Amino acid sequence: MAKLHRLISAVLRLAAAGAAAAAAVIMVTSHETTSLFGIEMEAKYSYTPSFVFFVVAFAVTFAYSLLAAVLVRPGTTASRLVLLSDVTVGMLLTGAVAATGAISQVGKSGNEHAGWLPICAQVQAYCGHVMGALIAGFVSLLLYFLIIMYSLHAVAEPLCSCH
């Protein structure tokens, strides 16, 4: 049973690492230059602080997921510390996806009340990259939710006499 726990944990963590790496790489490669009324406009992820936060959060998640997949053995005392770290990473990912999603919505739809115009009609490839990064980010976040639920089960299972 311990080998099965370790295998499931490793597979979930490696999948989360892959999704996190994809999210970071897709966001980093989001770049487009266009001309609007003779004025050159450049859209790049590094111009938006929430997108930079997104890249850093998912890069950290990638590294942590790989380390945890290799080093963590479910059911050990250390797995409880890793569970705490998993929850922290889950909160980090939630913040990154939420911040990026909010800014993306403004980029797509603008904000009439603030006088902000939408930009996605002018830089469609850029906005497509950002959307792809968000999708990969949501997948990674969902996998971290599953990791947390599975880790809670693995930690609580030896404590429960109900089996």
Swiss-Prot record:
<feature type="transmembrane region" description="Helical">
    <location>
        <begin position="51"/>
        <end position="71"/>
    </location>
</feature>
<keyword id="KW-0812">Transmembrane</keyword>
<feature type="topological domain" description="Cytoplasmic">
    <location>
        <begin position="151"/>
        <end position="163"/>
    </location>
</feature>
<dbReference type="Pfam" id="PF04535">
    <property type="entry name" value="CASP_dom"/>
</dbReference>
<feature type="transmembrane region" description="Helical">
    <location>
        <begin position="81"/>
        <end position="101"/>
    </location>
</feature>
<keyword id="KW-0472">Membrane</keyword>
<feature type="topological domain" description="Extracellular">
    <location>
        <begin position="29"/>
        <end position="50"/>
    </location>
</feature>
<dbReference type="InterPro" id="IPR044173">
    <property type="entry name" value="CASPL"/>
</dbReference>
<dbReference type="GO" id="GO:0035264">
    <property type="term" value="P:multicellular organism growth"/>
</dbReference>
<dbReference type="GO" id="GO:0009741">
    <property type="term" value="P:response to brassinosteroid"/>
</dbReference>
<feature type="topological domain" description="Cytoplasmic">
    <location>
        <begin position="72"/>
        <end position="80"/>
    </location>
</feature>
<feature type="topological domain" description="Extracellular">
    <location>
        <begin position="102"/>
        <end position="129"/>
    </location>
</feature>
<dbReference type="GO" id="GO:0005886">
    <property type="term" value="C:plasma membrane"/>
</dbReference>
<feature type="transmembrane region" description="Helical">
    <location>
        <begin position="8"/>
        <end position="28"/>
    </location>
</feature>
<keyword id="KW-1133">Transmembrane helix</keyword>
<dbReference type="InterPro" id="IPR006702">
    <property type="entry name" value="CASP_dom"/>
</dbReference>
<dbReference type="GO" id="GO:0009733">
    <property type="term" value="P:response to auxin"/>
</dbReference>
<keyword id="KW-1003">Cell membrane</keyword>
<feature type="transmembrane region" description="Helical">
    <location>
        <begin position="130"/>
        <end position="150"/>
    </location>
</feature>
<dbReference type="InterPro" id="IPR006459">
    <property type="entry name" value="CASP/CASPL"/>
</dbReference>
<dbReference type="GO" id="GO:0009826">
    <property type="term" value="P:unidimensional cell growth"/>
</dbReference>
<feature type="topological domain" description="Cytoplasmic">
    <location>
        <begin position="1"/>
        <end position="7"/>
    </location>
</feature>
<protein>
    <recommendedName>
        <fullName>CASP-like protein 1C2</fullName>
    </recommendedName>
</protein>
<comment type="subunit">
    <text>Homodimer and heterodimers.</text>
</comment>
<comment type="similarity">
    <text>Belongs to the Casparian strip membrane proteins (CASP) family.</text>
</comment>
